[in-house]
């Protein structure tokens, strides 16, 4: 993935700059103050973590993987997905990623990016193990946990990633007890160990 291009692509493609007005598909915070004109290229660290999500999900969604641009913007509502006119972008607030990293580590940022990306993957390449009765947010949770399983964080990294997912829910998200089953399904269907997930969800793991 080129470090100097502001895009997260789940297929090998060069994206044009995102110009569509778009609709907020999911935001982990209020999007009322977002100013798209302040979008900037992502940091190298953010691109590297987005690359982990890319590597985790590409084998699953290929050949129907979505193409997503990644931007940073201080006015963004923590992190969000915007889509419209056949284009999509994930926008994150750099101060939010700094806060998450300091409190929860790299795996937490991977999980939050994967949740946003999961909305797009679910539209273009739905998996048979995803229950269509789940809400869009639960399906995105399942994809986030799938990515975590593929990234294979340490037990403590998984615990902290789940803690971050719980700490920063989308506005439309159901309660944590409703989210856990979808997260567990995504984790185990993508090769993760169910007992490890259960320990992490219970706040255990070293």
Model region roles, listed by residue range:
Residues 1-9:
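Bacterial N-terminal signal peptides that target proteins for export
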Residues 16-21:
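N-terminal signal peptide c-region/cleavage motif recognized by signal peptidases
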Residues 22-98, 128, 138, 149-206:
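C-terminal capping/extension segments of zinc metalloprotease domains
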Residues 48, 52, 108, 112, ...:
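Extracytoplasmic/secreted proteins, especially bacterial periplasmic and envelope-associated proteins
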Residues 84-92, 109-118:
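Short coil-to-beta-strand
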Residues 96-111, 130-132:
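Short pre-active-site segment immediately N-terminal to the catalytic Zn-binding motif
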Residues 117-133, 147, 152:
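Catalytic Zn2+-binding segment of zinc metalloproteases
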